[in-house]
Structure formats: structure tokens, C-alpha cells
């Protein structure tokens, strides 16, 4: 399966979200949907923050595609973060080698549904050694 197929199958669809991205911990976008594409600089910032101090995201926020999301919840032990920007939101899960970002843009998908879908993608990759 290509990296893009993980985004398409785990992060996009009814009850999952409207998109997402997989980036490396050193930066670099492995796969992304059109509506959730971090720039090269953004992917490095997210990957570095998640690799070193994910709790710091609450102070800095997360920028994806030029949009800044306020981080509302972090669990440093689990390597997770949740963020909002108006009706939009993101779920972030860190694996050994990557950061999985789930994205939703309206009330048709709840933050909980998006977080669950993002977790399932991250868990699948962790079980595969990523």
C-alpha cells in the first residue's frame, strides 16, 4: 500500500474526516490530502516538535497549509495532540517514525470520530514498525 492510500483509507470518509497527512519526524510529507497539506517548513516544524516535545505545541500551535490551529489538548505520554480553528480541527498522533494528522472541517465529523480514525491509522503503522 502506498502512503497516500493510508491517508485515503484511514482518514477520509464518513465518520472519519475530510483529509489528513503523514509526515516524517524529521519533516517531509509522505502523503497528504489536498485540504491538509503541510508545506516543507510546516512539516519540519511539526515533525521536530512531535519528536522532541509534543507538549510544546500548546504554546506554539500548529500551522498546516498556512492555517494556524490552536492546540487544545496534549498527552505527551501517548504522543497525541488535538487542535481547533473555528469549526475545523486536527488530531495528531506520533509513531516511532512519523506523525499522523487527521483533519475535519465541519460538524458532520466530530472531534472524537476524527481522533479515532487518526488513532487507527497510527496504530496500524506502529504495528508495522513505523
Curated annotation (Swiss-Prot):
Protein location: Cytoplasm, Cytoskeleton; Cell projection, Phagocytic cup; Cytoplasmic vesicle, Phagosome
Transmembrane residues, as ranges? Answer: none
Entry keyword rRNA-binding: no
Q: Does the keyword Translocase apply?
A: no
Keywords noted in UniProt: Actin-binding, Cell projection, Cytoplasm, Cytoplasmic vesicle, Cytoskeleton
Q: Chief location of this protein? A: cytoplasm
One Pfam family named in its UniProt record: Profilin
Single GO cellular component term: cell cortex
Family, as annotated: Belongs to the profilin family.
Q: What does this protein do?
A: Binds to actin and affects the structure of the cytoskeleton. At high concentrations, profilin prevents the polymerization of actin, whereas it enhances it at low concentrations. By binding to PIP2, it inhibits the formation of IP3 and DG.
Q: How does it assemble?
A: Interacts with actin. Interacts with RHO1 (GTP-bound form).
Name assigned to this protein: Profilin-1
Q: Which organism is it from?
A: Entamoeba histolytica (strain ATCC 30459 / HM-1:IMSS / ABRM)
Amino acid at each position: 500500500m502506498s502512503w497516500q492510500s493510508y491517508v485515503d483509507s484511514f482518514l477520509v470518509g464518513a465518520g472519519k474526516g475530510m483529509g489528513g497527512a503523514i509526515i516524517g519526524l524529521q519533516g517531509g510529507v509522505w502523503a497528504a490530502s489536498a485540504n491538509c497539506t503541510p508545506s516543507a517548513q510546516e512539516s519540519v516544524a511539526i515533525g521536530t516538535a512531535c519528536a522532541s516535545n509534543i507538549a510544546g505545541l500548546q504554546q506554539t500551535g500548529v500551522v498546516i497549509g498556512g492555517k494556524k490551529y490552536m492546540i487544545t489538548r496534549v498527552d505527551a505520554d501517548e504522543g497525541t495532540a488535538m487542535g481547533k480553528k473555528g469549526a475545523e480541527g486536527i488530531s495528531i498522533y506520533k509513531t516511532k517514525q512519523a506523525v499522523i494528522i487527521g483533519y475535519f472541517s465541519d460538524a458532520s465529523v466530530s472531534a472524537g470520530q476524527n481522533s479515532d480514525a487518526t488513532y487507527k491509522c497510527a496504530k496500524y503503522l506502529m504495528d508495522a514498525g513505523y
